[in-house]
Amino acid sequence: DTRPPGFTPFR
């Protein structure tokens, strides 16, 4: 994954 730390799929 190339997502930043603390990224949440929830809006």
From Swiss-Prot:
Single annotated GO MF: toxin activity
Keywords tagged on the record: Bradykinin receptor impairing toxin, G-protein coupled receptor impairing toxin, Secreted, Toxin
Cellular compartments per GO CC: extracellular space
GO terms for biological process, alphabetical: defense response; negative regulation of blood pressure; positive regulation of smooth muscle contraction
Tissues/organs with expression: Expressed by the venom gland.
One Pfam match: Bradykinin
Cellular compartments annotated: Secreted
First-listed, main subcellular location of the protein, grouped into a coarse class: secreted
Family: Belongs to the bradykinin-related peptide family.
Further comment found in the protein's record: Cyphokinin is hydrolyzed by ACE by only 27.3% (compared to bradykinin). [Thr6]-bradykinin is hydrolyzed by ACE by only 22.7% (compared to bradykinin).
UniProt-recorded name of the protein: Cyphokinin
